[in-house]
Every structure is written in structure tokens, then in C-alpha cells.
Amino acid sequence: MSKTLLAGYFIWGVFFVILFCLRPGSVLHTITIEAKSRNTRWLSFLTLTMTILLCVLPMSLSPSYNGEKPDYMNQYELLTESFLEGHLYIDYDDIDPKLIALDNPYDPEAREAADVSFHWDHAFYNGHYYMYFGVVPVFLLFLPYRLLTGMSLTTYHATQIFTALFIAGVFSLFYMLGKTFFKKLSLGLYLTLSTAFSVISVWYAVSAPALYCTAISAAVCMEIWSFFFFIRAVFVCETDRGSIRYAFFGSLTGALAFGCRPPIALANLFVLPLLAVYLKNRKFTFRLGKQLLFAASPYMAVGVLLMLYNYARFDNPFEFGQAYQLTIADQSHYGSFFSRFQPLKTFDSICKFFVGYTPMSDQFPFVSFNGILLNFPILALPFFGIASEGVRREMREHKLTRCIMALFCIPLLIAFTDVLWAPTVLERYRMDVYWIICLLCFLIAGLYCQNLTPKTARKFSCLLSIWAFLSICKCVLLFLVPYDYNFTFYYVQALEKIRKILMLGRGVGLY
């Protein structure tokens, strides 16, 4: 028997074993999330570990992202060296004088006509190259690693770290929500949804981990922990002192997200309904005002530092460098945010963001990139679940109504920002909102479970767990699509080998 056939039997064997474990009669659907035993703790830890490994290990496969052929993907490493040298620009020694001489160096047609040599996807201002991606990862990982080891941290390793911390944040947040609000939630549904929603949120970073996804993974990592701290402060902590302490850390991680990827940081608006819940039964006093000011102080401190950083580079505290990009479009004349707003065009782009459809491919792995709800139909669950009177009643009882409404609105706001500022909407931009919709889906699923009889709850847990597992499989197929210089883009022969393994050596060739 060939190795290809053995590998195929093994993979399909694992597939059916997992389906067997998720069968309707499985004990995973009868044990609740509150169960306390050594076996459940080990199972949870094993699931978390396997999820992290599933997402982190494949990041090293593509030479464009693992450091073998860095091209322009090593900007974080270069900026770290620039900081150590005492300046904010990336010190390239090959700046083309023709680029400086152009009246508008940001016009791609003008650059092509003048045959200009330049560094792709950098910000260029006053004769210097800058990195316009969020600077916070430099201070969190790249600089400490460089100072401690004397070596540069390869960019994709930072993405691996942020991704692992994000996944740990998802499992922690979902567990806390389950213990607080969803006493009837089964252990199996908690584990499968935590795994699936972690993978859905970061699958693109697994495929193309360096630079762009370093900033994105850092931002979603900061935000998921910000949500964890804020929700714990409002719904779990029993003392004001504990609540303010957790709110401070929520503010700190939420503020740092602005220095990673600003559109994702718009999720900080989730603080507003949480604050309303916190203040509802409290009398506002001078002491409470001081406590809230302390809790919010990281927003002010980080905001001031980011504005100073922007001003030092671009003479504008609100300019992150987007207007000075050397890329596919001239963004220097985009004007104000709302001057670019065209109702019909913007509406069309937002629709494509969420429900855009691309026909399936006739080549392995057959899937194509679609809008969020077509990529992963499981994420449409909240739009149906919210129609249940039982779900709405649970929302009111747990004071979650405003919070859930905010989670419906925030993805639209982030999508609106993405489609207005970007010259074209790319697949990686959907990472900005996947995690929020996943959180919303978990909340609605948990609330729905509370109104079911034990028998119906087991069936619901089984069906949704299997759906979550199949969504993970869809992520694997999307990872295999040759795109954006990823692993299968470089190694077509590897894609063909994977096809043969999954099809047990049968079927026609890729080409």
C-alpha cells in the first residue's frame, strides 16, 4: 500500500472518528460546561493545544512569509532596527532620486512612466520610507526579543504568538460566558464552537502570516482580551475594586489595538453598552468618576502616544501613513473620510463584504473566497436565533440586549470603514470582523440552549457541533487555495499531492 493511500486513510479515519465523537448519543452533549473533573479539564486543555498547533504550525510553510524570501514582508524587523538606531524611518540606502523628483510619487501610473525603482507597500514622505502598519507589535514583541537575544524576530513568529494568544482568549472568554450565562451549554458545544470560531477568525493569517496579518492578528488578540476583561469587570466581579482593575486592563488592551489596526479597534465601542449596564444600578459619585477615569486612562495615554508618533513621522497626529502608500492606488488625494462616501457604491461593497459570491472552482480544492456569511454559513445563526422569543427573554434577563445589539452593529461599522478607505477589499480584511460575528454566534447559541429540553438540547448540541467541525474543514480547504504567495501558490506539486491523498489516489490531475 502506498504512502499516499495510507495518509489518505489516516486523514479520513480521523475525520470519521471526530464525527463519531460528536454523534447524538455522545457524552459530550450531556456533560455541561460546569462539569468539574480531571477528564474534562484535560480534554479542554488538549482541544486548546491542538487548535493552537493547527493554526500556528502551517504558518512556516510559505517562503514568502517564513523569512526565506522576505521581499517587503520584513518591515517590522527593519523598523525595530531603525528604532534602535534612533529614528522612525526605515533606512534604505537605495532611494531612487527619480521617486523624489516626481510631483506625485503616490501615483502608480506616474511611477511606471518614469521607470521608478521603489519599495512596494511602504509609506514615503519627505524622502524617507516608513512602515504604515501598526507599530504596537514592535514594542510588544520585536524590540524585547531583539534586546534579549540580539537577533531579529522573524515576522511570522510574531503572528504565531499573537494567534496563539488570541485562541487562548477565545477559549477563556467563551468559558467565562458559559459559566456566567449558559449553565446548560454542553461541554461538546463549548469545545467545538471555541475551536471552530478560533480557526474561522484566523485562517487567513495561517495562510499568509507575515506583515499584514501580523498587524491584524495583534489587533484581534488585543481586542479579544479586552472583551474578556471588560465583560469580567461588568458581569463577573462582585466588588467595585475588582471591576475597575479588570476594566483598566480592558482599556489597555483595547487601546493597544488602535496601534495595531485601527478598523479592528472600532470594536472598543462595545464598551458603551457594558458601561451602561455597569452604571444602571449605581449612583454616580465623585469617587466613582475617579475610578472610571482611572479605568479609561490607558485610552488617553496610548492615544496621545500614537498621535505623537504620527506627528513625528507625517506632521499630522491623525495620519497613520495611508495617504502616503506606494501601492496599487494613489491614496494621497482621497480627501476626508466622508468625502469618499458614495451611497450605492459603498452599499454594494458592504454587501460583497458579507454576502459576495464567487463561483466554485473546477480545480482542487474547489472552494472560492466569498462574503463572510457564504464562506461560513454557521455565522448566519444569530440572524435567525434573535427571532426566538426565548433568546430575547434570556437577553433581557441577563442584561445582554444592548451588548448583543452592539455586536450586530460593530461589524457593519468596521466593514464600512474598510470599504471606504481601501482601494479594493481583499480577503484578509474580513479578518477584521470574523471574530466579532463568531462571538455573537456563540452568545446566541448559548442563549438558545437555555430554553431547550434536555433531549432537544442534546440534538441541538450535536447538530451545531458537527456544523462547527465542518466549518473547520472548510477553513482547511480555503488554506489550500493558491493565493497571495501562500504555500500552495509556491508549491503546486504539494497541492496535487494533497489532492491525491484526500481522494485516496483517485481522480484526474490538477492540470
Where are these regions (language model features)?
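Interfacial juxtamembrane loops and adjacent helix segments
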Residues: 85-133, 196-207, 327-363
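Specific aromatic-rich, kink-prone transmembrane helix
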Residues: 218-238, 249-254, 268-270, 436-440
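Perimembrane helix-loop-helix junctions
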Residues: 267-303, 393
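Start-transfer (signal-anchor) and selected internal transmembrane alpha helices
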Residues: 2-71, 188-191, 244, 286-298, ...
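Transmembrane-helix signature of polytopic, membrane-embedded enzymes
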Residues: 170-201, 221, 238-245, 399-402, ...
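Hydrophobic, aromatic-rich transmembrane alpha-helices
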Residues: 359-364, 370-401, 440
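Transmembrane-helix motifs of polytopic, lipid-linked glycan transferases
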Residues: 151-183, 224-229
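Membrane-interface alpha helices of multi-pass inner-membrane proteins
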Residues: 224, 245-261, 268-269, 293, ...
